[in-house]
Curated annotation (Swiss-Prot):
E.C. no: 3.4.22.45
Post-translational note: The viral RNA2 of bymoviruses is expressed as a single polyprotein which undergoes post-translational proteolytic processing resulting in the production of at least two individual proteins. The HC-pro cleaves its C-terminus autocatalytically (Potential).
Entry keywords, A to Z: Hydrolase, Protease, Thiol protease
Protein name from the UniProt record: Genome polyprotein 2
Catalytic residue list: 143, 215
Domain Peptidase C6: 135-255
SUPFAM superfamilies the UniProt entry points to: TMV-like viral coat proteins (SSF47195)
Family recorded in the similarity comment: Belongs to the bymoviruses polyprotein 2 family.
Top EC class for this record: hydrolase
Catalysed reactions, semicolon-separated: Hydrolyzes a Gly-|-Gly bond at its own C-terminus, commonly in the sequence -Tyr-Xaa-Val-Gly-|-Gly, in the processing of the potyviral polyprotein
Length: 890
C-alpha cells in the first residue's frame, strides 16, 4: 500500500531525500549509497501516492475504505479531551483466530503502534524504530517496497550497483498487490545475493482481521485492530514463513484493491481493438451452415442470408481492463478478425451476388460462394488470434507481468505453427459437412510457415524427401483421428456467442494519449461525427447492462435454444416457428422466473404466444383477424426498439398478411363460386378451368387449409358433374349427394354459395314429379277433380320450394352469426392486446428494474468504420448501420 520516505527536514517537495539526516547521532548515522539513492529516487517518482489522493485510509477488496489510520488521533485530539476519554476505549483489540495466530500476534498492549507520527515506523519488538523514509507514501498496492528501504542501508559498497538493479526491477516483476508467498520468495532471493541484509530490521507487516489482506506499516502506524506478524527482521520473516508454508495466509495479498488488473502499457493506439469485430472459427462455420439451410432461390431467403452475414462477430472482446480470452480447446476456438479490408472485400463480393436478380445467380452458385467464405481462416491465418498472439503482436503486458514477455513470445510462435497446420483441415471438414460432397471449392493457398529465429545459426542437414512425405502422411492421419474424436467430444458442449451488430468495422486511431482511468467519463460524449453515421441503435458489446432489451440476454444463462428462436424469427419460416413456439414458451417461462433481465423474456413470450395463435389460424383457415395482425405489428415494433431484428423483406406478421392475401385456398374458393353460378356449357368450361388450376397448385407447398379446399372443391365439382350427366331415373341420390356436399362446403369455408345447375335440376325433378302424379289420375274423374288434384300438386311443389329456400336461409343466418362473432373478436382482441402490453411494460419498468445492477456502460472510442455490408436486417442480433452499400428498396 503505502510507506514512508525520508525521516526529517523534507521541504518544498524536494526529491533529494536519500541525502537527508536519518536516525542517530550525525557521527554514527548510516548513509545510503549514491547509486541506491538515485534508484530509489526513480522508484519513488513512478510509484508514489498522488498528492491529492487520500493517504489516511486502506481500501478493501471491494474498492471501499476498510480501515482508517491514526486510531488514537480522534480519541486524543487535545490534552483536556485525553484526560476525559474513557479508559475502556483506550485499548484497541480484536479476536485472534487460530489460523491467524500462526503468523500474527495480538498487539493491543502496544497502543503506540496505532498512532501516526512524523518520525519512524516500528519493527516487531514494538520498541525499536526502523530506518525508513517518511516524506512520501507509496501508491496502493506497492506498500511492500517499505520492506526494502532498511535493507538499502546495509548493502556493502561492492554490492551497491547490483542492489540498485534489483530495486529497479522489483516493482515491474512483482507488480501491484503481490501475495505474501511472492514476497517471501523475493526475500529469499535477496538474501542469496546480498547476505549482509539478513539481520536488517523490517517494518511491521500487519494483517487485517478475518481477511487475507496485509499491509507493510509506515509512519502512519497500524490500522485499528490489525495484527502484526511475528517477525522484525529479514531473517525472522524468512524463518516464520518457512515454518508455515502450508498456511492459507500465504495466498493473501500485500496491499489493497486499487485500480485492479489491466494491461499495463495500453494506450489510445490500442482502442480500436475495443470496437473491432472478432468471431471464433467454430461460430463462423456454424453461422454459414445456418445460411446454407435457407432457400437461396427466393428473394426472402437471400435477404435473410444477407442479414445473417451483416451481424457476424462480437465487439468489446478486449479492452484495457479486460484481457483477451484464453485459448482453450482446439483450433476452432481461435478468433478471426473480421474488421479488416481483406475479409471485407470477400464479403462485398458475396453481398453483390445476394443483391443481384434471381436470374443472374442460381441458388447453387450462392451456396458455393457461402461455402467459400468458410475458408477465410485458412486463407488469412495472419488475422487469427489467440491470447499469446494478440499480446505479442501488440506488445501488451498484463498487470505488470513483464517477466512473462519471453514465454508469451514463445507461445505465440507455437500457436502460429499450430494454426498454420490445422486451418486447412477445419475448412475441409466444413466443406464436407455443409455440401455433402456436392461442391468443390478452391483449395486454400499455402500459408507462410513461421520459424523460430535463433540467436546463433543452427546447422542441419537436408532431410530425405521420402522421410518428409512419410512423416506428413502419418501426422495427417493421426491429426485427423484426434481431431475427429475431439470434435465428437466438443459437439455437446458447443457454446455460441451472441452475434453482433453491423459487420464488419475497420477502425484506426492516431491518438497516442493515455486512456482515461476507470470510472472517469470520456473526454467527449459519443455522438455523430461528420464522416460517420451511427446506427439507429447502439452496437451491443459483451457487457450486458439493460434489463428490457436483447442486450441483457446472457446466452450462457438462456441457453442455445433461445438463440435458435431469435434466429428462427429472423429467418421468418412460419412452419419452423410453429413447431418451435410451444417448447420456446416453456423455456421462456423458466427464464422469466430464474434468469436476470427477465423483462425481455416476458415480452418475447407474449409475442410468441400471439404469433403461435396467428400461425395456427393461418394454417387452418388461411385467415388472420386484423386485430391479431395489428397486435403482432405493435409487439414487433416494441421488440425491434429493444434490440430484436426483423427482416424488412417480411416479418412474421407481414408474411402471414401476405399469405392471407395470396392464399391458394381462397383463390380456389372464389373460382368455385364462379363455376357454381354458371349453367350448361359455361359451367363445364369454368369447372375445367378450376380443375386445371387445382392440378397446377398441387405441385406447390400448401397449407392444411389449401389441401382441404382442393379436396372439397374437387369432390363437389365431381358430384355436380355426375348429377348433370346421370340418367333421370337415377338423378335423386346423386342430386341429394351434390346438395349435401355443397352445404358441407359452405359450412367449412364460411360461404353461402348456391349452384345454379343443382337448383335447375331440383326444380326440373319437382316439376316432373308433379306431372307424373297428375298423369296418374283416373280418366273417369271429373274436370273439377282433375283441377283439384293439379292444385294440390302445385301446393306441394310450393311447399318443397319453400323448404329448400328455408335451408338456404338457415345457412345464410349461420354465416351472419359467424361474421358477428368475428366482429366481436376484432373489437375485443385489440383491447386485450393493449392490456397485455401495458402489463408487460409495467413489469419492465418495475420488477425487472429491482434486480442487481449490471456493469456500467463503457463508451467505445470513436472510429471510422469500414463496412462490407450495411442495411437493416433480421439476423442474430440488433443493429442496422448505414455505410457505403445499401440494399435497394423495392
Amino acid at each position: 500500500m503505502s510507506t514512508s520516505s525520508s525521516r526529517l527536514f523534507f521541504d518544498c517537495g524536494s526529491l533529494d531525500w536519500p541525502n537527508k539526516s536519518l536516525f542517530g547521532d550525525p557521527t554514527t548515522r548510516d548513509v545510503m549509497d549514491e547509486h541506491i539513492s538515485s534508484t530509489w529516487n526513480a522508484v519513488i517518482r513512478r510509484h508514489m501516492l498522488a498528492p491529492n489522493a487520500d493517504a489516511e485510509t486502506i481500501l478493501g477488496r471491494d474498492g471501499l475504505p476498510s480501515a482508517q489510520f491514526d486510531a488514537y488521533g480522534a480519541m486524543l485530539p487535545s490534552f483536556i479531551q485525553a484526560l476525559n476519554a474513557p479508559t475502556t476505549r483506550l485499548r484497541i483489540s480484536a479476536p485472534l483466530s487460530t489460523a491467524e495466530s500462526i503468523l500474527c500476534a495480538d498487539a493491543s498492549h502496544a497502543p503506540w503502534l496505532y498512532m501516526a507520527n512524523s518520525v519512524c515506523a516500528y519493527e516487531a519488538t514494538h520498541l525499536q524504530p526502523v530506518q525508513t523514509f517518511i516524506a512520501f507514501n507509496f501508491a496502493h498496492g506497492y506498500c511492500y517496497l517499505s520492506l526494502f528501504i532498511p535493507l538499502s542501508f546495509r548493502i556493502t559498497p561492492e554490492n551497491a550497483r547490483s542492489f540498485s538493479r534489483f530495486l529497479e526491477q522489483l516493482p515491474d516483476i512483482l507488480g501491484a498487490y503481490p501475495t505474501l508467498a511472492s514476497l517471501y520468495k523475493t526475500m529469499l532471493f535477496a538474501v542469496r545475493l546480498f547476505p549482509e541484509v539478513l539481520q536488517a530490521p523490517i517494518p511491521i507487516i500487519a494483517k487485517r482481521p478475518g481477511v487475507l489482506q496485509f499491509h507493510v506499516s509506515d509512519a502512519r502506524g497500524l490500522p485499528p485492530s490489525w495484527f502484526p506478524m511475528k517477525c522484525g527482521s529479514v531473517a525472522s520473516f524468512i524463518a516464520l514463513i518457512t515454518n508455515n508454508l502450508n498456511s492459507d495466509l500465504l495466498n493473501g495479498i500485500v496491499g489493497s484493491n486499487g485500480d485492479g488488473e489491466h494491461y499495463t502499457n495500453w494506450n489510445s493506439g490500442h482502442n480500436h481493438w475495443i470496437v473491432n469485430r472478432f468471431i471464433t472459427v467454430k461460430d463462423l462455420h456454424s453461422s454459414l451452415k445456418s445460411a446454407l439451410e435457407v432457400d437461396l432461390d427466393t428473394e426472402g431467403g437471400r435477404n435473410a442470408v444477407l442479414d445473417l452475414l451483416l451481424d457476424l462477430g462480437v465487439t468489446n472482446l478486449v479492452r484495457r481492463e479486460k484481457r483477451f480470452p484464453a485459448y482453450f480447446q482446439g483450433a476452432e476456438s481461435v478468433y478471426l478478425l473480421l474488421s479488416c479490408e481483406r475479409v471485407g472485400n470477400e464479403l462485398v463480393a458475396v453481398q453483390d451476388a445476394l443483391q443481384e436478380p434471381l436470374a443472374n445467380y442460381t441458388g447453387k452458385d450462392l451456396r458455393a460462394l457461402i461455402i467459400n467464405l468458410g475458408g477465410l481462416p485458412s486463407r488469412h491465418p495472419e488475422i487469427c488470434y489467440t491470447r499469446n498472439i494478440f499480446e505479442n503482436d501488440n506488445h501488451l503486458v498484463w498487470n505488470f507481468e513483464f517477466y512473462r514477455i519471453a514465454s508469451i513470445t514463445k507461445n505465440a510462435q507455437i500457436d502460429r505453427d499450430v494454426l498454420s497446420s490445422s486451418m486447412a483441415n477445419l475448412f475441409s471438414d466444413f466443406v464436407s459437412e455443409s455440401s455433402n460432397g456436392e461442391y468443390r471449392v478452391k483449395e486454400p493457398r499455402p500459408v507462410t510457415q513461421y520459424r523460430v529465429e535463433h540467436d546463433e545459426p543452427v546447422a542441419s542437414g537436408a532431410p530425405s524427401a521420402w522421410w518428409q512425405v512419410l512423416v506428413g502422411i502419418t501426422t495427417a492421419i493421426l491429426g485427423a483421428i484426434i481431431f475427429f474424436l475431439w470434435r465428437c467430444f466438443l459437439r455437446a458442449k458447443r457454446v455460441k456467442f451472441q452475434a453482433k451488430d453491423s459487420f464488419p468495422w475497420f477502425t484506426t486511431s492516431g491518438d497516442d494519449d493515455l486512456p482515461p482511468p476507470p470510472g472517469d467519463s470520456p473526454s467527449r460524449p459519443p455522438g455523430r461525427s461528420p464522416d460517420r453515421v451511427l446506427p439507429r441503435t447502439v452496437v451491443r458489446d459483451l457487457s450486458f447492462n439493460d434489463d428490457d432489451d436483447l442486450h441483457s440476454v446472457d446466452l450462457n444463462e438462456a441457453g442455445s435454444r433461445f438463440g435458435e428462436v431469435v434466429s428462427l424469427i429472423a429467418r421468418g419460416n412460419l412452419r419452423e416457428l410453429a413447431g418451435a413456439i410451444p417448447e420456446s414458451l416453456s423455456n421462456l417461462t423458466l427464464l422469466q422466473t430464474s434468469a436476470s433481465g427477465s423483462g425481455f423474456y416476458t415480452m418475447v413470450a407474449l409475442y410468441l404466444a400471439t404469433l403461435g395463435d396467428a400461425i395456427t389460424a393461418f394454417h387452418e383457415h388461411n385467415d388472420a383477424s386484423p386485430a391479431t395482425i395489428q397486435s403482432l405489428r405493435t409487439l414487433e415494433l416494441q421488440l425491434e426498439a429493444r434490440g430484436l431484428r426483423f427482416n424488412e423483406a417480411g416479418t412474421p406478421a407481414n408474411l402471414i398478411q401476405r399469405g392471407v392475401k395470396s392464399s391458394v385456398g381462397r383463390a380456389l374458393v372464389r373460382l368455385t363460386q364462379s363455376a357454381l353460378l354458371a349453367t350448361g356449357e359455361n359451367f363445364r368450361t369454368r369447372m375445367a378451368a378450376t380443375l386445371e388450376r387445382i392440378a397446377a397448385e398441387r405441385l406447390n407447398t400448401l397449407t392444411a387449409y389449401d389441401q382441404r379446399v382442393i379436396e372439397m372443391t374437387t369432390e363437389l365439382l365431381a358430384a355436380i358433374k355426375t348429377a348433370l350427366e346421370v340418367e333421370r331415373s337415377e338423378l335423386t341420390p346423386h342430386l341429394a349427394n351434390a346438395e349435401a356436399l355443397l352445404q358441407v362446403y359452405n359450412n367449412l369455408f364460411s360461404t353461402d354459395y348456391a349452384s345454379a345447375s343443382l337448383l335447375a335440376l331440383r326444380r326440373e325433378m319437382i316439376l316432373r314429379s308433379a306431372e307424373g302424379r297428375v298423369g296418374e289420375q283416373p280418366t273417369s274423374a271429373s274436370d273439377a277433380a282433375n283441377e283439384e288434384l293439379v292444385q294440390r300438386s302445385m301446393t306441394k311443389l310450393d311447399k318443397e320450394i319453400e323448404l329448400f329456400q328455408a335451408q338456404i336461409d338457415s345457412q345464410r343466418r349461420a354465416v351472419t352469426i359467424t361474421e358477428a362473432s368475428n366482429l366481436r373478436e376484432n373489437i375485443l382482441q385489440p383491447i386485450n392486446t393493449v392490456a397485455n402490453i401495458a402489463m408487460a411494460g409495467a413489469f419492465l419498468r418495475g420488477g425487472a428494474r429491482h434486480r442487481m445492477p449490471g456493469i456500467p456502460d463503457v463508451a467505445a472510442p470513436m472510429s471510422n468504420p469500414f463496412r462490407a455490408f450495411s442495411g437493416r436486417g433480421h439476423s442474430l442480433t440488433t443493429t442496422r448501420g448505414a455505410g457505403l452499400f445499401r440494399r435497394p428498396r423495392v
